[in-house]
């Protein structure tokens, strides 16, 4: 006996099920479903509701980004806080306590 899509097994005949009732409810009728137009409208309403939720989420994200943009971020280099405006920038001090070496001078670290 074959086991493919057209076999007796896939049609339910091997289990003793009448071909006319295979895959149907107890009474041999399919479960009641709303008409296609009603189901289509339900799906459309669900899609529109989800779209509104996503648009609300996007608007909230844009508002947060606007609020964050109003704040002035600190300088990326972590500049000297005590420096006065217009003063020359102070060199950064490395974690080892010394000034950073020029990467191109070839000098070895101590």
Curated annotation (Swiss-Prot):
Chain positions covered by the region annotation Disordered: 1-42, 66-110
> Is Ion transport found in the keyword set?
no
Where, if anywhere, are coiled coils annotated?
Answer: 36-68
Instruction: Name the UniProt key words of this record, in alphabetical order.
Output: Coiled coil
Q: Which residues form the signal peptide?
A: none
Gene from which this protein is expressed: C1orf122
User: Which protein is depicted?
Assistant: Uncharacterized protein C1orf122
Which InterPro entries does the UniProt record give? DUF4726
Q: Which Pfam families match?
A: DUF4726 (PF15855)
Annotated organism of origin: Homo sapiens (Human)
């Amino acid at each position: 006996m074959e086991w493919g899509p057209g076999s007796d097994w896939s049609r339910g005949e091997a289990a003793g099920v009448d071909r006319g009732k295979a895959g149907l409810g107890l009474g041999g009728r399919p479960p009641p479903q709303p008409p296609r137009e009603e189901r289509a409208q339900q799906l459309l309403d669900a899609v529109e509701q989800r779209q509104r939720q996503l648009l609300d989420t996007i608007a909230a994200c844009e508002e947060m980004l606007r609020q964050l943009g109003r704040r002035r971020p600190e300088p990326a280099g972590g500049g000297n806080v005590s420096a006065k405006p217009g003063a020359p920038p102070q060199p950064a001090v490395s974690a080892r306590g010394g000034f950073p070496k020029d990467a191109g001078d070839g000098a070895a670290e101590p």
